Amino acid sequence: MPKTVGFVGFSESGKTTLATRVAAELTRRGFRVAALKDAHHGFDMDKPGKDSWRYREAGASQVIVRSDRRWAMLVETPEQPSVEELLARFSDVDVILVEGFKNEGAFLKIEVRRRACEANPRLSLMHDDVVAVASDFEEPDERVPRLDINDPAAVADFVVSL
């Protein structure tokens, strides 16, 4: 069972920047890393006119595209899948880094905060699954450890320790 750790926070808090830097650090250390990202707005990996797009437009509910070094599966679903359903799709990995899903998922989470966004509510005070805060400033009354948002190696150490 891979170690699963979430990076949660509000928009523009630096979640993607920190999580990708931690992914790079863990990969450098030899871990096999996977990532799951929550997109609040619709997204599309296809481009109009491309073959995979044409299959989807023709009604295919699942399309796999393969090249020499990667593959991707596009799935149309009537309902949004749960985070647990998505996590179950990963295989052959040591660590799964999850971005978003602050109100979903039975996994430990690191809140990402920046001074520029300090007016946002503190998730670490509202969610028991938040086990650390990665930030660029100190806050009073923090109930969990504070990690330096600009030190991905230290955040990676924390992830490994969980």
Which stretches of residues belong to each language-model region?
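N-terminal phosphate/diphosphate-binding loop that engages ATP/GTP or pyrophosphate donors
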Residues: 21-84
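Walker A (P-loop) ATP-phosphate-binding motif of ABC ATPase nucleotide-binding domains
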Residues: 4
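Conserved lysine of the Walker
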Residues: 15
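Hydrophobic anchor at the beta1->P-loop junction of P-loop NTPases
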Residues: 7
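Phosphate-binding/switch loop-helix module in NTP-utilizing enzymes
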Residues: 74-104
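Phosphate/Mg2+-binding loops and adjacent switch elements
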Residues: 95-162
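Walker A (P-loop) phosphate-binding loop of P-loop NTPases
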Residues: 12
